[in-house]
Amino acid sequence: MKKKLKTFSLILLTGSLLVACGRGEVSSHSATLWEQIVYAFAKSIQWLSFNHSIGLGIILFTLIIRAIMMPLYNMQMKSSQKMQEIQPRLKELQKKYPGKDPDSRLKLNDEMQSMYKAEGVNPYASVLPLLIQLPVLWALFQALTRVSFLKVGTFLSLELSQPDPYYILPVLAALFTFLSTWLTNKAAVEKNIALTLMTYVMPFIILVTSFNFASGVVLYWTVSNAFQVFQILLLNNPYKIIKVREEAVRVAHEKEQRVKRAKRKASKKRK
């Protein structure tokens, strides 16, 4: 059910973004509410462009937006982590009720809901943050591509309106994309082909796409993905998650051994 809800939410969100993805110039005279939001983002970037450095404004505004959304990101990652932890038990339930008849489906759903409640897991908790984050990031992207005064200027000798001729920003954007996906998937309880492919395919797509995008847009991708890496290490460090998980397994194993020893002693005393 969670997959269906997430798929529906992504379809709905994609449809909404496609409606909002016009390519025309956005200005203070633009008519739609979405374009006014995009223009407000652009003006905020301009206000943060100290010494008329649009590149600096892009960096600062991206960091501010990302920092504001950190609680939502944390909520999403915590929910995803909990869902990963109970995946083996969910698969056991699916094996227990393999039937496709309504009665089996109902029993499976009831036991899954009981497990969610017992473990404090909300299967929908990772959807809401996603619905909020993506429109904000899309508005920021459109501000960089549809507002004229953000398409001019230089940053570290790079023309923000032109692709990076030295390929520095595309490589950095791809590198930070790889690191963020790799770190996110490192602590996954169960590895699968889809996760592995995403780890390597997404950075490649970002790299190739960035060759033809304006440097201002690629600068935004680079800063955004770099901040994503920082967020993961700060809030959902996979090394800490793995360490805690291994410690829990060790404690459970020791407890099991103590119970076995106690049973053996009790058995010897009876003899």
Swiss-Prot record:
Subcellular location: Cell membrane
Keyword annotations from UniProtKB, A to Z: Cell membrane, Chaperone, Lipoprotein, Membrane, Palmitate, Protein transport, Signal, Transmembrane, Transmembrane helix, Transport
GO biological process terms on file: protein insertion into membrane; protein transport
GO cellular component, one term: plasma membrane
Membrane protein topology class: Multi-pass membrane protein
Covalently attached lipid (N-palmitoyl cysteine), positions: C21
InterPro entries noted in UniProt: YidC/ALB3/OXA1/COX18, YidC/Oxa/ALB_C, YidC/YidC1/YidC2_Firmicutes, YidC_ALB_C
Keyword Transmembrane: yes
GO MF, one example: membrane insertase activity
Residues spanning the membrane: 45-65, 124-144, 163-183, 201-221
Lipidation (S-diacylglycerol cysteine): C21
UniProt xrefs under Pfam families: 60KD_IMP (PF02096)
Leader sequence residues: 1-20
Family: Belongs to the OXA1/ALB3/YidC family. Type 2 subfamily.
Biological role: Required for the insertion and/or proper folding and/or complex formation of integral membrane proteins into the membrane. Involved in integration of membrane proteins that insert both dependently and independently of the Sec translocase complex, as well as at least some lipoproteins.
HAMAP family: YidC_type2 (MF_01811)
PANTHER family: CYTOCHROME C OXIDASE ASSEMBLY PROTEIN COX18, MITOCHONDRIAL (PTHR12428:SF65), OXA1 (PTHR12428)
Name of protein: Membrane protein insertase YidC 1
Record lineage: Bacteria, Bacillati, Bacillota, Bacilli, Lactobacillales
